[in-house]
């Protein structure tokens, strides 16, 4: 936490405590990205590469009142507890803000748990993250997520619908 701009992955989300971490500068061709700072944010290092781009500004937004329509994209990052974060989005006004941004044509990207939060519902039948068996999502995507006993992380391949090229990750 003592050295700035050394461009290595942060150890934990301590670095995201600041409101703005981007190295980019606002200009006419700048891509301005807002990231909702979820209480259980994870995989936030996925965004660090964007912060290093000179024509990209990444702002971590802690409260829904911090949001404005100046953003080219809003990102919901990964979450360690999507069940709790879904409730937090509703309680803090983020759900309304994000829904309005989507209705107005705003671009929204969900990464991992953030993608799950954009769906209709999240089920937790075995209580992995919560005593609640299900919570409503943002209802912006027609998906339902069911949390199961064992988490499996693996590389997948597919075809990009826009250009028919093979992708993997």
Predicted features and spans:
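C-terminal lobe/tail of nucleotide-utilizing enzymes
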Residues: 1-59, 64-72, 125, 140-169
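Phosphate-binding active sites in nucleotide-utilizing proteins
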Residues: 32-113, 117-120
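Cysteine-nucleophile active-site neighborhood
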Residues: 79-169
């Amino acid at each position: 936490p003592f050295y700035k701009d050394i461009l290595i992955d942060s150890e934990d989300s301590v670095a995201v405590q600041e409101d703005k971490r981007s190295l980019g500068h606002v200009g006419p061709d700048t891509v301005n990205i807002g990231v909702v700072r979820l209480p259980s944010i994870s995989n936030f290092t996925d965004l660090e590469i964007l912060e290093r781009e000179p024509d990209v500004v990444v702002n971590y937004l802690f409260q829904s009142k911090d949001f404005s329509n100046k953003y080219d994209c809003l990102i919901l990052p990964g979450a360690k507890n999507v069940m709790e974060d879904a409730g937090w989005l509703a309680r803090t006004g983020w759900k309304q803000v994000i829904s309005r941004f989507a209705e107005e044509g705003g671009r929204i990207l969900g990464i991992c748990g953030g993608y799950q939060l954009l769906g209709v519902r999240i089920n937790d039948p075995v209580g992995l993250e919560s005593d609640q068996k299900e919570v409503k999502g943002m209802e912006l995507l027609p998906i339902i997520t069911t949390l199961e006993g064992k988490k499996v992380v693996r590389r997948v391949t597919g075809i990009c619908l826009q250009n028919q090229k093979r992708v993997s990750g």
